[in-house]
Structure formats: structure tokens, C-alpha cells
Amino acid sequence: MTDDVVDESSDEDVPQRGHNRQPIVSVLGHVDHGKTSLLDMVRSIGSQRQASVMDREAGGITQHIGATEVPADVLNETCAAMLGGKQFKSPGLLFIDTPGHHSFASLRNRGGSVADIAVLVVDIMEGLQPQTIESLNILKETRTPFVIAGNKVDRLHGWRCEKGRSFIESFSSQREDVQALFEERYWKTVGQFSEHGFNLERYDQIRDFRQNVALVPMSAKEGEGLQDLLAVTVGLAERFLEDRLTDTLGSAQGTVLEMRDEVGMGKTVDVILFRGSLRVGDTIMLAGQDGPFTTHIKGLKRPQGMAEMRDAGKRWVNFDSVEAACGVKIVAPKLEATIAGTTLHLANTSEERELAEEAIREEWRAVFNTMPVMCSSCNSIFARQDFQEHTASGPCKGAEENRSGVVIKADTVGGLEALAFELHQRNIPVRQATVGPVNKKDILMAKSATDPLQKVILGFSTKASTSDVASQLEED
């Protein structure tokens, strides 16, 4: 007999996993509820730390691509009081600043949202607001787990804040009347979330995180409760998203946030890389106005130190290679046609190119199928994929699309989808939907509509392509 244990299972039965990458965290919230203050406070941890380690290239928080990367050592130091001597397994957190809900919606790949987990910032004094509800709907649609940052506890009358203190420690030090004020606001917020089908509970009182959404009370302005929020976010990601966070092998993929014209660099694209790695010289495939196209990476860049992406100026650091998950600025030829919100694919081999092209075309088919169209028989409005089912049987069997509708334009795929969704809710069909500036073809298409009410071009974060087009729009 031998003590050796023979594993008879095939290697093919065990999914191949890569290294444990940092979770990608998207921050959402209603205007003025404190999303910007929260991100600023997260960044301030790094600036304070960086001041004490100025000679070290590592350490601190790196700003890049509309994202804030919080390294593991900063997380462990910030949350030390809550960790009790333990340390996180995660190499860090990558916060993505999503300035609009359509931006979050565009951070997706074919498997769902690129964001692994989200933080929804809610002003505990105001509760749920229209954009909060919109955010909840998007999180539900993309099946993204999330944590609630119950912000602005400092606005409770008599609440005493202390920067960096945990909420648990803070709450126990407040007067009884102040605690009662908090409980009143807390239970009101719980009731509002319940109306939308979510079981909300204070994070330190949850027994099963699968059944309840965690609320972390905090003050983003003062930094109180920040360590609680970071600890809960990392803890949930490590506990429930292990398979997703180790799914890093295979050809590189990333979401294009935007195309920019940088002085001294030319056309560049800002990308969130969520799988694989990229090197200078790699061939990549992107979605363009005329379909998929390939180009070669000439440079991979990140801002130096704490510099913001949009204000980095000449303070860029060049990299030979980058690994997921990270944000990176890519310098390459022929990027001007790139469509923001689409997926970048590595395309070094013929097999990779073939798979990338099909994935990009499938991505566009999915967008095309969300457009609202009118049934030629009953004049009802359906999303295109639902229209096909509607006309397969019943009184409208064999009916065709009524080629009427408005023209819509947006700066990103997510913007296009958001606009189409709003129009569908209002029973307005879409005749043509494209990404990019309004051009003469769009004007001709709108003019050709038979219904006067549909001689319209609706733009979402976009403008006229030339001054001539702008003048024509004003005249019409």
C-alpha cells in the first residue's frame, strides 16, 4: 500500500485559473449624494501615504483611465483596525468612476458587466432618488453584486465625526438621541429599498450576505466609515467572486472607455483591461464605424504618481506590458474610428482574429436587437428581438417591421442603448441608430420620415460632425 492519493479525474474536468486579480469596483449614485466625495476620499488615502514614501515608485494610489487603483498594502493599512491582524488576499481594488449611468451600462463584455462589484452611494438624509432607482435597475439587469454606502451621517444633528474612524466605533460613541435619529433614517431607507425588492441591512448585522444587501453608514466628506466600506467590498469580492477574479487566462480583452487626441501622442484609446495581458507590438482588434479593424500597439501608458488621466500633461509612464485588471492608455495607428463602449480583443494569431471579429459582430447584433421597432400589423412597439417572437404566431404572424421611427446618435454604445431604452418606454420606434457625431446622412434619413413627428434626430452626448452640418441642423 502507498500513502499517495491518486486523482483519477481528468485535467479537462478542472477549469484552468489564472492569478487572483484585483476586483473592479464601479461607483454609482444620484447627483450630489457624495459619489465624487467618496472617490476623492479614497484617492486621499494614497496621497497621504505617498507623501511618506516619495522615493518609492510602488505604494500609494495610482490614478489612471478614470480609475483609482488601491494597492493591497494601502487596503490592509487602512482597514487594519477591522482586520484584527489578518490581511486581504486581493492584490487591491480598481475603482472605476462612471460619470453617467450609460457609462456603467457600456462597461460590459459578452458575459455581463465588466464591474465585478458596485458601490451605490445613497444620501441617508434623502434616501432613494430617481438616479438611484435607475442605478438599481442597471445593477439588477447586469446581475452585478453591490454594497450601499449610506453617506452623509455627518449631517445628522449632533453627530460627531472623526476622520478614519470605523462606523462601529463612531456609532457607539454618539449620544442616544443622535443614535435614534440615525435609526429613523436607516429604517426609512430600508423601507424604500424593500419597495424595489431588495432586503437591506446594516453590514455588521447581516448573517447571510447572499440574502441581504449590505449598507455601510459613512461620511465620505470626513472619511468616517471608509475602512468599513473598503473591508466589506473586498471581503464580499473575495468570498463570492473567486471564480470570476481568477478568470484571467486567455486572450486579452478590455472595454474601450473613450478615444482621445493627446498632444504629442496622436489618437489614443483609454481601456479597462479585464482579461489577459497586452504588450507593445501586439495586434489588437477593435470595433469601428465600418466594422472590426486591426492595429498594432505602439505604446502603453499610465499617468505618473497621483496625476489624473485628464490632467496628466506630460507626466506619463511607459510600460512594455500590462496585466488585467487595470486601466491603460493605448497609443496605436488608425484609432480615430474606434467606438467607445465596445470591447478590445487581442488578435496576434489568425484564430484570435477570427474569434475577435465574430465577438465584435455579435456585440453589435446584440445592440441592434435592443432597438424599438413598430409592427406593421398592430402598430405596437417592441424591442427587435421581441418583435421576431411576436410575429412568429398569432394575429400578427408574418408581419414586418414598419420602417418608421426617429434617428438616434450617441457617443458610446452604452449611450445608444440607454437612449433606445428610454424611447422604448415611451413607445417611440427607432429607424436608425449609430455611434458618432451627427452627419449629413443622418439629416437626410430624418427628413425622409413620412410622419412629421418622426423627422427628428435625438443625440446623446454627441454633436454635429462639421460646422456645415451644424448650420443645416439650425436651418431645419
PLM regions: where:
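N-terminal intrinsically disordered, low-complexity, charge/repeat-rich segments that act as generic
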Residues: 131-219, 232, 408, 414-476
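Inter-motif core of Ras-like GTPase G domains
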Residues: 105-126, 133, 137-147
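P-loop NTPase nucleotide-binding/switch module
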Residues: 1-30, 36-96, 159-220, 233, ...
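Conserved glycine(s) of the Walker
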Residues: 34, 225
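C-terminal effector/interaction modules appended to NTPase cores
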Residues: 4-11, 78, 89, 122, ...
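Conserved catalytic network of the ASCE P-loop NTPase/AAA+ motor domain
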Residues: 17-20, 54, 61-62, 84-89, ...
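Residues immediately C-terminal
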Residues: 33, 101, 126-127, 155-158
